[in-house]
Amino acid sequence: NLKRYIKKLGYDNVEVICHGITEPAKTPVDTPYLLPVEKATQNVFGPYMVYPNRPSTAPDYLWTNILGLPTIQVRWCDATSDNHAPNEHLTLSNYIKGTELTATVLKEISEM
């Protein structure tokens, strides 16, 4: 609980007001869609790491929990892109690779 955690840190003068939450969502790693995504990512970006769980406030639950569809997120940026920082950026090279990756994945999945 966030309120308990903040209090434990010694901040008694902080008020936490919850206006809403994002439901958790998870696609099983044995989904048949993972292999084409992994293959395309390897071909376009080279070596990469798969994170079976990733904290995110992306609305994946709409796809997984409501529509019953799998979701797989692939980052186009590199470790120096400072995600969600004021100076967040994406190189032109990674933008082009990301576009290629998306097109490749869509093609591979359409042929399944």
Task: Please name every model-derived segment.
Residues N1-Y5:
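Short amphipathic alpha-helices in soluble, non-transmembrane regions
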Residues L9-M112:
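An extended, acidic, His-containing surface patch that forms the Zn2+-binding/catalytic region
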